[in-house]
């Protein structure tokens, strides 16, 4: 494998957002979080519905949703029928998808 010669931009790796980015990767290191992020990429769902989708108890699902909400990855919309969750933007979903595609590619190369 040949390495590309790349001109590094200092701001890309010396950023005040580095710790927050590492926090996002820490959340993505949890399979439950990745399942949830992938499940709500295109829809907003209640904690009960999401628990059914990811096959977890509602209390565990709610706990994980709170962690994702605290990190700013998901947001909660309060409605008369209850709370609904959705991704804040596409970035976390894109990271989770990229990780899955990377893992699939690595598996195919073996």
Model-flagged regions — what are they?
Residues 1-7, 43, 56, 71:
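Residue-level marker of intrinsically disordered, low-complexity segments enriched
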Residues 52, 69-70:
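Alpha-helical residues within the helix-turn-helix
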Residues 44-45, 69, 100:
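Residue-level detector of secondary-structure transition/capping positions
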Residues 19-60, 79-91:
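N-terminal helix-turn-helix DNA-binding core of bacterial DNA-binding proteins
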Residues 1-20, 89-110:
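Amphipathic alpha-helical dimerization/coiled-coil segments
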Residues 64:
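Residues within the DNA-recognition helix of helix-turn-helix
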């Amino acid at each position: 494998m040949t390495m590309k010669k790349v001109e590094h931009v200092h701001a890309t790796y010396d950023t005040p957002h580095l710790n927050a980015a590492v926090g996002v990767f820490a959340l993505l290191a949890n399979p439950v979080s990745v399942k949830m992020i992938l499940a709500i990429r295109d829809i907003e769902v209640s904690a009960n519905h999401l628990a059914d989708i990811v096959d977890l108890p509602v209390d565990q699902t709610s706990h994980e949703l709170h962690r994702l909400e605290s990190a700013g990855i998901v947001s909660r919309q309060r409605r008369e029928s209850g709370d609904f969750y959705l991704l804040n933007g596409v970035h976390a979903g894109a990271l989770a998808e990229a990780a899955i595609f990377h893992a699939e590619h690595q598996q195919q190369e073996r």
